[in-house]
Amino acid sequence: MKRRNFLNRLSLSAGAVLLSSGCRQPIDKKETPDKGDLAGNTNSGFIVEPSREIPVVDKTDVLVVGGGPGGVAAAIAASRTGARTILVERYNHLGGLWTGGLVLPLLSTHGLSRKNEQIKAIYGIGDEIAERLKNLGMAVNEVNPVVDPEAAKYVLEMMVKEAGITMYYHSWAANVISSDDTIKAVILETKSGRVAIEPKVVIDCTGDGDIFHLAGEDYDVMQFEIGLVHRLGNVDRVDPSRPGYNKINIGGETPIPSVNWVNMTGGEYEDALDFKRLSELQQEHRIEIWDN
């Protein structure tokens, strides 16, 4: 390589480094607190976590753990009574499996009457959510409408904000502190470290009963066919009038033209609380989606 070309490349590389460095702002350096010596015999397969003080970052009348549709409805209902309400969610969006898991049908908006006719069965906050999505043009079908997940996230976000609810994302419920059969504090695992919230009332909307379990309540372990839902685009680009065309139903209609959603269920019943098996299934299903 000629020296000039080498220097030119070197200067470009240096510029790239400077540019990337300039994208970050320095903050005050924080020292990692002393975790103490590791207690316990690691050869036994267990360790003992050293005790530590956990900062109480908030106090509230009602704490709702889990920001799925049930958690959002519970938080809005609590806030509308005048109670100060906090909603915590482990991910970066509301809606749970409805939005993040792409389980897009809004079930069940209708039921069968004694005359075997479809009658409306959803009212209250659930109905408000459905109507907002319809007004945005982001719901198809009157009965059990299929929605757009990003629109649903937006609608839920707006309703939570309008209700005056304090929202904490990226917060995973890790433990509870109980006394006299009452939860006094919920401990959250966050990127800021472990923090605690002291509520008067806790509503468990985690979907798996995490708070019930952490509080020491009895529970049953269920097994499910664990699948991975996905969306498929450009499914209506083929001219159906073309000779030899055979229609194949691939998934259900969504509010976005040419985009269908596909519910790929698992073939065997699995334990949804086994994080190792869930990790394996996540990999297997995602590869299967692309390979098929």
Show the residue positions of the predicted features.
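Short, low-complexity, disordered segments immediately C-terminal to signal peptides
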Residues: 24-39
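Conserved beta-strand-loop-beta-strand element in the redox core of flavoprotein oxidoreductases
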Residues: 177-195
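N-terminal export signals
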Residues: 5-26
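Flavin (FAD/FMN)-binding glycine-rich loop and adjacent Rossmann-like elements that form
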Residues: 53, 125, 153, 170, ...
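A short, basic/flexible loop-to-alpha-helix module at the beginning of a structural domain
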Residues: 44-59
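N-terminal Rossmann-fold NAD(P) dinucleotide-binding loop
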Residues: 71
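Conserved N-terminal/central alpha/beta ligand/cofactor-binding core
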Residues: 11, 77, 83-84, 89-175, ...
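Beta1/beta-strand and adjacent pyrophosphate-binding region of the FAD-binding site
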Residues: 57-68
